Amino acid sequence: MKITNVSKVLSGPNPHHVDARKMYESPHAVAVVITLQPGESLKKHITPVDVFFYVLEGSGIVEIGDEKEIVGKDMLVESPAKVPHRWTNETSGVFRVLVVKVPKPAEETRLL
């Protein structure tokens, strides 16, 4: 058994310049916890594989393709491969999301 504590994982460099902590990586999947402080957002990007997002804390805006919704804690959002998406925190609180890419991408995410 392996247990990973998110507070012990260092935030890795990323093109969005936000707190992103890789919690799990295997040939089959990648899981990252992203924390957006008030006013922060991800750049719109395309992921080469399907992604699902689970909101851990707070609320924020998710954009996938032409759709835009406000989501909050304990909501799961599905995002198909190769569809532009991004997250935005327009609240005064922290917004944390678990990002799971399945399978692990063989190519890099592309910023738009």
Named regions from a protein language model:
Residues 1-28, 77-78, 111-112:
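A short, N-terminal "cap"/entry segment at the start of jelly-roll beta-barrel domains
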Residues 32-47, 81:
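Conserved short histidine dyad/triad with adjacent acidic residue
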Residues 35-37, 47-62, 100:
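Short, conserved beta-strand element in jelly-roll/cupin
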Residues 42-44, 62-63, 79, 85-91:
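Short beta-strand His + acidic residue motifs that chelate non-heme Fe in jelly-roll/DSBH
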Residues 67-81:
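Short acidic-glycine-tyrosine-enriched beta hairpin
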Residues 81-106:
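Ligand-binding loop in jelly-roll beta-barrel domains
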